[in-house]
UniProtKB/Swiss-Prot annotation:
Coiled coil: none annotated. The C-terminal di-lysine motif confers endoplasmic reticulum localization. The DHHC domain is required for palmitoyltransferase activity. A motif (Di-lysine motif) lies at residues 340-343. GO terms for cellular component: endoplasmic reticulum; endoplasmic reticulum membrane; Golgi apparatus; Golgi membrane; plasma membrane. The active site is at C179. This is Palmitoyltransferase ZDHHC4.
Length: 343
């Protein structure tokens, strides 16, 4: 099968999986399909192998560890090594602007800075000492965050918008999610660093994709390959088309073409996730609240606390106060002053 067909199939499967994960988290029908699929596989895969797989998955996703942090740095190192080893030198020979070529390195430095800050910054851990301060930050909506609820694990009163992270075993103020790639919770005090990290990572992948693609296109134009003809398997003379050009470039520069494919896919995935995170920031929602929002007033969820009403009410986000106020709350979190007082 042609490389281009395989790559497009791979791209379609990756994007389909990404979309299904996003939609499946909000769609009970897809969750049911995934659950039934898991049951089918449980009859096929030996029990000992199932236990081993579950143990590995539990370690990777339900305990704090540096596996994905190391994997992140290895992948980033491999991509930049290939860029430096081949693409940078070849682009210099084609007289690319040095500002253009050094941009991915500048983005890498900034990205590593925000990556480190996302990893090491306290996301807003709630303790006995700061419990009262956090209780005053956000208003309780009585739906998703009712008053006078205690965390059964930490034995602390739960401030509005907080959540207990089972991975880190702590309650986090304005909890968004636990990110395995930074081995840390994303909360009130490090969301700004996480968004900046995600933006620079997306920008570096997109910039590298553009530089590499422009290099390949310029190479094709300079060599006049696109003006040539070739004889196909049936002995017919054919004009060079896109499929042939991709095959030709893959045989000539396999590592560069593979890199282009990887960073293009990565740019789409990161770009989509970045847009989702920016939407949450603009509307003053967290990932946890977005996920729980549709179920807050669900009549089929009796475990959800809701006041008696004559007719069902729709969940309303009471924490959104306009675009600029919402963004200011993330990038200049009010809780930073509480942290200084505590010290």
């Amino acid at each position: 099968m042609d490389f281009l067909v395989l790559f497009l199939l791979y791209l379609a499967l990756v994007l389909l999986g990404f979309v299904m994960i996003c939609i499946g988290s909000k769609t009970h029908y897809l969750q049911g399909l995934i659950s039934r699929g898991a049951q089918v596989f449980s009859y096929i895969i030996p029990e000992c192998l199932q236990r081993a797989m579950l143990s590995v998955l539990h370690y990777l996703f339900h305990t704090r560890n540096y596996t994905f942090v190391v994997l992140h740095l290895i992948l980033q190192g491999m991509v930049y090594t290939e860029y430096t080893w081949e693409i940078f030198g070849l682009c210099q020979q084609l007289e690319f602007s040095l500002y253009y070529l050094f941009l991915p390195y500048l983005l890498l430095i900034v990205n590593l800075l925000f990556f480190t800050l996302s990893c090491v910054t306290n996301p807003g851990t709630i303790t006995k000492a700061n419990e009262l301060l956090f209780l005053q930050v956000y208003e309780f909506d009585g739906v998703m965050f009712p008053k006078n609820v205690r965390c059964p694990t930490c034995d602390l009163r739960k401030p509005a918008r907080s959540k207990h992270c089972s991975v880190c075993n702590r309650c986090v103020h304005r909890f968004d999610h636990h990110c395995v790639w930074v081995n840390n919770c994303i909360g009130a005090w490090n969301t700004r660093y996480f968004l900046s990290y995600l933006f620079t990572l997306t920008a570096s992948a997109a910039t590298m994709a553009v530089v590499s693609t422009v290099f390949l296109v310029r190479l094709v134009v300079m060599s006049d390959v696109y003006l040539q003809t070739y004889v196909d398997d049936l002995g017919h003379l054919q004009v060079v088309d896109t499929v042939f050009l991709v095959q030709y470039l893959f045989l000539t520069f396999p590592r560069i073409v593979f890199l282009v494919g990887f960073v293009v896919v990565l740019s789409f995935l990161l770009g989509g996730y970045l847009c989702f995170c920016l939407y949450l920031a603009a509307t003053n929602q967290t990932t946890n609240e977005w996920y729980k929002g549709d179920r807050a007033w669900c009549q089929h969820c009796p475990h959800v606390a809701r006041p008696p009403a004559a007719e069902p009410q729709a969940y309303r986000n009471i924490h959104s106060h306009g675009l600029w106020s919402n963004l200011r709350e993330i990038f200049l979190p009010a809780t930073a002053c509480y942290e200084r007082k505590e010290k």
